[in-house]
């Protein structure tokens, strides 16, 4: 079990003095993850699965070990894990890989990241698929009763984020997944903001597919991610890419492809990144996923104190139990980008501002953007307190109703 101090000591980026509250965008990389990647470059920097020399054998072994480490985090088997460069790629594998018929329906929510909306919009144009969005409550929650009105027998796929990246609300994915199954639909979970932050069990969720990046909750490197496919669902998907590394044999006009999951990983992959992601999965397990979730709840509860500041409006539910480690807000009379810039300039506090790649969610709130603060296990109470103090000063000096 790693303490907060242990983890902070492991993250070189924090030694710059930054108060980093932009974890929903990307997280800093711990030194053990960097070391695993450097070890690849320094000791066995070879391609995988292409050759018999010892360097390529070791590279292949370490690459494949990462599959099992990822699987352990979400209670899957290694054979159900496809390596991707991010969650976006995983979602697009579903969009381009399933067999669609005119009139099929995809159900998402109004709160989705653009990566879980735009691929379905393309299917509307190219395949005659219909996209329906489940409405949210004023607090940006998706109620099962609202989902029940949208999901029907015409629904081929339900695609829902576990935690809203823009607002931080935790959605009832188990209940939504049951609605999908009851109507004969497939169920895809965008777990970009939950894996590594809280327990995620694909067996309990009952999903057919799950997409996640490596560079957020898992503390892994950018350009990595994974796609979980329930073992009996591989036959329903075509690979997104075809090429080297996924064939058993090739004739002039035909080829025989390898079995999943490798058939979905054409071309030379991000070998050091995936090895780093495997080490990152070990790292968050060493901390303890429950321990991470508990600490993030505590820090989020502290961040929610900003709702008491005059001129500050916080979006989403007051109940921290319905939130991940994300708090989205605005200061009346001050543009969201200006607030983020002032937090940076005054106190080296890093937050995100804008529509957070969730423009429909912003329209639901009636704003063009928000300021978003987001935590991880390593953040300190003192850092959150500093953020609150500086925000209060900004609101006092520049805010208005």
What are the functions of these language-model segments?
Residues 1-401:
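Pyridoxal 5′-phosphate
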């Amino acid at each position: 079990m790693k303490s907060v101090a242990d983890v902070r000591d492991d993250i070189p980026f924090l030694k710059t003095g930054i108060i980093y509250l932009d974890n929903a965008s990307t997280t800093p990389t711990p030194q053990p993850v960097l070391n695993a990647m450097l070890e690849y470059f320094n000791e066995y920097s070879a391609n995988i699965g292409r050759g018999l020399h010892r360097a390529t054998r070791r590279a292949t072994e370490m690459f494949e070990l990462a599959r099992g480490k990822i699987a352990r985090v979400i209670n899957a088997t290694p054979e159900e894990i496809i390596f991707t460069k991010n969650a976006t790629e995983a979602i697009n594998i579903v969009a381009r890989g399933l067999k669609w018929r005119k009139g099929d329906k995809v159900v998402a929510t109004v709160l989705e990241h653009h990566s879980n909306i735009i691929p379905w919009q393309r299917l509307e144009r190219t395949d005659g698929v219909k996209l329906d969005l489940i409405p949210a409550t004023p607090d940006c929650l998706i109620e099962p009763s609202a989902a029940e009105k949208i999901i029907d027998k015409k629904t081929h796929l339900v695609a829902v984020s576990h935690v809203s990246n823009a607002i931080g609300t935790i959605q009832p994915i188990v209940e939504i997944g049951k609605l999908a199954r009851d109507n004969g639909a497939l169920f895809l979970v965008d777990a970009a903001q939950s894996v590594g932050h809280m327990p995620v069990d694909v067996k309990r969720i009952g999903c057919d597919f799950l997409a996640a990046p490596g560079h957020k909750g898992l503390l892994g490197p950018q350009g990595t991610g994974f796609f979980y496919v329930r073992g009996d669902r591989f036959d329903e998907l075509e690979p997104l890419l075809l090429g080297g590394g996924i064939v058993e044999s090739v004739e002039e006009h035909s080829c025989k492809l390898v079995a999943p999951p490798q058939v979905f990983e054409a071309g030379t992959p991000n070998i050091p990144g995936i090895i780093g992601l495997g080490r990152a999965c070990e790292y968050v397990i060493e901390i303890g996923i429950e321990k991470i979730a508990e600490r993030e709840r505590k820090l989020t509860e502290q961040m929610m104190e900003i709702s008491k500041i005059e001129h500050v409006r916080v979006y989403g539910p007051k109940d921290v139990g319905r939130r991940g480690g994300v708090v989205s807000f605005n200061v009346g009379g001050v543009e969201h980008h200006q607030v983020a810039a002032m937090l940076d300039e005054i106190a080296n506090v890093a937050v995100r501002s804008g529509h957070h790649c969730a423009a429909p969610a912003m329209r639901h709130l009636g704003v063009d953007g928000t300021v978003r603060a987001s935590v991880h296990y390593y953040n300190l109470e003192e850092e959150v307190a500093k953020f609150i103090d500086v925000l209060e000063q900004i609101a006092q000096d520049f805010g208005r109703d």
